[in-house]
Amino acid sequence: QVFDQACKGVYDRAIFKKLDRVCDDCYNLYRKPYVATSCRQNCYSNLVFRQCLDDLLLVDVVDEYVSGVQIV
């Protein structure tokens, strides 16, 4: 599922796919179902999503992802 109905911001399919990919990659890294679920909670505005960015070595583009979270 690309779109989370709980998100109240702008619906932008490209941004959702990008944020969702982080959660998918993080799940593939750890293979724990709760990782994927927790990562998507609160429209990606949570500590698990931020930790996934770190774990996937995306720290140099964190601001880009954070601004995406703020849009959705």
UniProtKB/Swiss-Prot annotation:
Keywords: Amidation, Carbohydrate metabolism, D-amino acid, Disulfide bond, Glucose metabolism, Hormone, Neuropeptide, Pyrrolidone carboxylic acid, Secreted
UniProt KW DNA repair keyword: no
Modified residues (D-phenylalanine): F3
Positions of modified residues (Pyrrolidone carboxylic acid): Q1
Any single GO BP term: circadian rhythm
A cellular component annotation (GO) from this entry: extracellular region
Pfam families: Crust_neurohorm
Residues carrying Valine amide: V72
Disulphide bonds in the chain: C7-C43, C23-C39, C26-C52
Maturation and modification: Stereoinversion of L-Phe (in CHHB-I) to D-Phe (in CHHB-II).
The UniProt record lists the keyword DNA repair: no
Entry similarity comment: Belongs to the arthropod CHH/MIH/GIH/VIH hormone family.
Protein name in UniProt: Crustacean hyperglycemic hormone B
The species this protein was found in: Cherax destructor
Organism lineage: Eukaryota, Metazoa, Ecdysozoa, Arthropoda, Crustacea
